[in-house]
Curated annotation (Swiss-Prot):
Organism classification: Eukaryota, Fungi, Dikarya, Ascomycota, Saccharomycotina
Positions that bind substrate: R53, G269, D270, T302
Positions bound to K(+): N55, S57, D88, T89
Pathway assignment: Carbohydrate degradation; glycolysis; pyruvate from D-glyceraldehyde 3-phosphate: step 5/5
Protein name as catalogued: Pyruvate kinase
Positions bound to ATP: N55, F56, S57, H58, R95, K181
Subunit: Homotetramer.
Chain positions of site Transition state stabilizer: K244
Record organism: Debaryomyces hansenii (strain ATCC 36239 / CBS 767 / BCRC 21394 / JCM 1990 / NBRC 0083 / IGC 2968)
């Protein structure tokens, strides 16, 4: 593999241009004050945006409702590919209290003070006593451990656990004691609930408004995912849950989380505070690889093109970061402040689009397909066997596309797992599935609007002919090209068992 990889890399086209090429990965953009506008959303979609992210750490329900409404209106103006909407929860968190008169108190290194969970100090914090709103902090932390305040801007070492409400700490560096700052406990297992009351209300808002996915913050165990499913209920059962891995517990318990979740986000911001920064890229690679083998979509997020918040061009390191996330196997890459508050949102999406396309063309797909196939657990279920066979057939036949006649998107996800080097056209009547299939690398939704006919095989042929016609019109394939198709033997999801090779 290494020799084949080296040989492949030496033959890359270094003059590759991204013009008029289908991008396999998807782009997620956070919508904020700079971009919450119908015309702006249309322009972002034309630049390559696939999934709208709403950050529920900020904004009112009225504001988020306007994002949803504007996103839907943008589709009425510009059809393009269906747009998915994601709700990113605030998540359970630990914060400091309120300082006296809301002042900032400067401190120097080696400054000793008290951290307390005593509510009497919740609004009386200063440079002597700071309230922490996590009641069990004295039970879970140990002397010698570090506490980060304000995303690690200020660090404290725990000197002594004085009693069940009090810690004696010493500052590691200079900084300021301020109101309502986030608190991180790196290397310490915490027992916070999976969802705060705000999160539960936010998720119910999302269910009511038909969001397509939940980005669930600070997931620590598989049980956290189960709790979110309970809140989603029957009405929200089709909403995809994406587990954000942001702490050491999430990394340690990743295998059980992966079983329960629909997908994963490698959320490198808080993760880089909770674990040493040099370890983040190793965790990123491991988590993405595990997701690829499990056929679970994975998103790489945080600071990908951050300098483009205020600059029209990214740093070279940022471009490499985006490209390497694609090479690692990420299905989606995400923009945060770049599109939420940045001065160059269109340029950021366009830069990510172009970088992703070029990175995708640097991948040796067939050796990757062969490796994933060799690692599959045997015997494979029928649908996965068909998905695997369709990709192998596409390589053997030099097919130009794989057409999946799909109800739920499940088969398309499995086809994506086996890394085809051609587009996967998911033909479906299911509008929701067409939107969340953006999570799967290389899968393109084609919504078939015509009603079903009684004869099943006739309905299959109608959808296939329509898909071929659409693909030819879009320039994805040419008449006479070989294509591989997957279909079921009967109506409904979970019945895919037929693979064919046909001519366009």
């Amino acid at each position: 593999m290494s020799n084949a990889s080296l040989s492949w890399l030496t033959k890359l086209n270094t003059s590759e241009t991204p013009d008029k090429v289908l991008r396999r990965s998807s782009i997620i953009g956070t919508i904020g004050p700079k971009t919450n506008n119908v015309d702006v959303l249309v322009k972002l979609r034309k630049a390559g945006l696939n999934i709208v992210r709403m950050n529920f750490s900020h904004g009112s329900y009225e504001y988020h409702q306007s994002v949803i409404d504007n996103a839907k209106q943008s589709e009425e103006i510009y059809k393009g590919r269906p747009l998915a909407i994601a709700l990113d929860t605030k998540g359970p968190e630990i914060r400091t209290g309120t300082t006296i008169d809301d002042k900032d108190y400067p401190i120097l290194p080696n400054h000793e003070m008290i951290f307390t969970t005593d509510e009497a100090y919740a609004k009386k914090c200063d440079d002597k006593v700071m309230f922490i709103d996590y009641k069990n902090i004295t039970k879970v932390i140990e002397a010698g451990k570090i506490i980060y305040i304000d995303d690690g801007v200020v660090s404290f070492e725990v000197l002594q656990i004085v009693d069940d409400k009090t810690l004696k700490v010493r500052s590691v560096n200079s900084g300021k004691i301020c109101s309502h700052k986030g608190v991180n406990l790196p290397g310490t297992d915490v027992d916070l609930p999976a969802l705060s009351e705000k999160d539960k209300a936010d998720i119910k808002f999302g269910v009511k408004n038909g969001v397509h996915m939940i980005f669930a913050s600070f997931i620590r165990t598989g049980d956290d995912i189960k709790e979110i499913r309970k809140v989603l209920g029957e009405e929200g059962k089709d909403i995809q849950i994406i587990a954000k891995i942001e702490n050491q517990q999430g990394v340690n318990n990743f295998d059980e989380i992966l079983v329960e979740t629909d997908g994963v986000m490698v959320a490198r911001g808080d993760l880089g505070i909770e674990i040493p920064a040099p370890q983040v890229f190793v965790v990123q690679k491991q988590l993405i690889a595990k997701c690829n083998l499990a056929a679970k979509p994975v998103i790489c997020a945080t600071q990908m093109l951050e300098s483009m918040t205020y600059n029209p061009r990214p740093t070279r390191a940022e471009v490499s970061d985006v490209g390497n996330a694609i090479l690692d196997g990420a299905d989606c890459v995400m923009l945060s402040g770049e599109t939420a508050k940045g001065n160059y949102p269109f340029e950021a999406v366009s830069m990510m689009h172009n970088t992703a396309i070029i990175a995708e063309k640097a991948i040796a797909y067939q050796p990757l397909h062969n490796e994933i196939r060799s690692l599959a657990n045997r015997p494979t279920p029928t649908t996965e066997t068909c998905a695997m066979a369709s990709v192998s057939a596409a390589y053997e036949q030099d097919a130009k596309a794989i057409v999946v006649l799909s109800t739920s998107g499940f088969t398309s996800r499995l086809v994506s797992k086996y890394k085809p080097n051609v587009p996967v056209m998911m033909v479906t009547r299911n509008h929701r599935a067409a939107r969340y299939c953006h999570l799967y690398r290389g899968v393109y939704p084609f919504v078939y609007e015509k009603k079903t006919v009684d004869n099943w095989q006739e309905d299959v042929e109608n959808r296939l002919r329509w898909a071929v016609s659409e693909a030819i019109d879009l320039g994805i394939i040419k008449k006479g090209d070989s294509i591989v198709t997957i279909q079921g033997w009967t109506r409904g999801s979970g019945h895919s068992n037929t693979v064919r090779v046909v001519q366009a």
